[in-house]
Amino acid sequence: MRIGYGEDSHRLEEGRPLYLCGLLIPSPVGALAHSDGDAALHALTDALLSAYGLGDIGLLFPDTDPRWRGERSEVFLREALRLVEARGAKLLQASLVLTLDRPKLGPHRKALVDSLSRLLRLPQDRIGLTFKTSEGLAPSHVQARAVVLLDG
């Protein structure tokens, strides 16, 4: 058994798209990032990589490489899954905490879990998804923290 932890955050700006868990979320603000800025998938990618000492998303997909400009974060997550599965790992469970003040994510919970289930190839009862706000301490950012449990 192995456990991995990942974390990511991005500044939010007016007029940018907000991607979370692979979905475009209706929002007046979105992530300022080199890729699509999906903090949720970035944290999950880092969690998978950390479980096997494979570095992090910045090592595999550096923001200095123009190939990754605007890239969908699903590409990064799929590669991290491929790398751990090549080592005989099976993803058993994922837990994710998303912190942002706006927009409220409650109305999108089902769609977000559906997307994570599809991307991670896990049943929905093996995915934990928690929403938090910064209580006004950091209203212009999104943060994601992820923990994964793998067998192998």
Curated annotation (Swiss-Prot):
Keywords linked to the UniProt accession: Isoprene biosynthesis, Lyase, Metal-binding
Dependence of activity on temperature: Thermostable.
GO BP terms, alphabetized: isopentenyl diphosphate biosynthetic process, methylerythritol 4-phosphate pathway; terpenoid biosynthetic process
Cited CDD domains: MECDP_synthase
Sequence similarity: Belongs to the IspF family.
Cysteine-cysteine disulfides: none
Name of the protein described by the UniProt record: 2-C-methyl-D-erythritol 2,4-cyclodiphosphate synthase
Cofactor note: Binds 1 divalent metal cation per subunit.
Subunit-structure text: Homotrimer.
Residues that bind 4-CDP-2-C-methyl-D-erythritol 2-phosphate: 8-10, 34-35, 56-58, 61-65, 100-106, 131-135
Record carries keyword DNA damage: no
EC number: 4.6.1.12
Gene3D superfamilies according to UniProt: 2-C-methyl-D-erythritol 2,4-cyclodiphosphate synthase (3.30.1330.50)
General function of this protein: Involved in the biosynthesis of isopentenyl diphosphate (IPP) and dimethylallyl diphosphate (DMAPP), two major building blocks of isoprenoid compounds. Catalyzes the conversion of 4-diphosphocytidyl-2-C-methyl-D-erythritol 2-phosphate (CDP-ME2P) to 2-C-methyl-D-erythritol 2,4-cyclodiphosphate (ME-CPP) with a corresponding release of cytidine 5-monophosphate (CMP).
Catalytic activity from the UniProt record: 4-CDP-2-C-methyl-D-erythritol 2-phosphate = 2-C-methyl-D-erythritol 2,4-cyclic diphosphate + CMP
Site (Transition state stabilizer) location in chain: 34, 133
Pfam families: YgbB
GO MF annotation list: 2-C-methyl-D-erythritol 2,4-cyclodiphosphate synthase activity; metal ion binding
Residues that, per the record, bind a divalent metal cation: 8, 10, 42
